[in-house]
Amino acid sequence: MVDVELVDIKGMSDTSLKKFMQENSISLKNEEARRIVNLIGRNPTLTEIHIFNIQWSEHSSYKSSRPILKTLPTKAPNVILGPVEDSGIVELGKINGEKYGIVVSHESHNHPSQVVPYEGAATGIGGIIRDVLCMGAKVIATADPLRFGNPFGKNKNHVKYIANEVINGIAGYSNAVGIPNLAGDVYFNESFDDNCLVNVVCLGILKEKDIIHSYAPKDAEGYDIVIVGKPTDNSGFGGAAFASLILDEEAKESNRGAVQVPDPFLKNVLIRATYEVFNEAKKQNVKLGFKDMGAGGIMCSTSELCSDGDYGAEIDLDKVHISMDIPSFMIAVSETQERFTWISPKRFTPSILKIYNEDFELSNVAEGAKASIIGKVTKSQDYLLRHKGKIVCNAPIKAITSGISYDRISKKPNRKFKEPIIKEKNDY
């Protein structure tokens, strides 16, 4: 299915537009959908609507929390890289004059873990590992602060099931990947009966000079866009939008498809293969862009890599390795796990393909897994997707990646809390 027909948002009534959104599993509000028309100057394709649905979700754009997050301190003498890429980096120290940094990333996987707890927690760990790895780091540890409902309350059986499966998911993924889970905490309270909190943290280590950035490097026009990992399927489709909604118990079954499917054994091999790409890039003195493929899938990783380097992108969805026949919008935004995107000069791309496809034989680890060239970096500021020879998306790349922001109504909390004063011991 190729999504080339324009959706007549301009001509729809508010009632018709709302119905269309519901029928197509799109969580945009009517005014947001109409905003797309103003941004791109015409009615959008279905693929373009799904792209903005992902990019304007709370999960991807932080449209409600961004104004508040901007008030937090992010700069200090020991901060090598603040919150502008996939992970932050804090100085660890210097050895023989070389500065080392600890790479830190954290996020939550709450809704997926409440709906499908094992897979939700496992893919939370998997995603946060990718965020650290793609900075060029050696991944060294994970952690998991957890919050569950009351195990002795009215929902005790379900709470215990959620808690056990979340812990099993974290353990099962971490053990197979071979990265130790070093820390975490757990609290139980009935306020979490219907929505557990599964926070995941990952740490890595690197030399400052070895940082790989989440954007296309300087003079990258014409560079290859290479994706690596599992073949794209329909798993995790709409995951970012789902993670941004208020969780509805009645809709739990229909939301299961928005939860991604983990493959930690493939991730284990992907990590080791990626370390080899790091080493080869150092030998050849090549600058690359590298980003994990999480929320928004191919669309999000490729658009952000190119946009953040002040480039555009042209992508042929027919070159994406897929495991099933799925429509254009699903190839573009599905959140299939265990995938990455590289921005590579053409002279280095054969090395990437050889390492993943021949040296580590990804296809023998997971059916259909491999590295594929799917497009190129362009000088234009457009994001262009083709499928079966037809254009399914042609929009300003900055419009796709800049997100939206709301100043939400706020009020003072009902209760005031104070941090406890803990006296330091003279001798521990």
Per-region residue spans from a language model:
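Glycine/proline-enriched, intrinsically flexible loops and inter-domain linkers
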Residues: M1-Y428
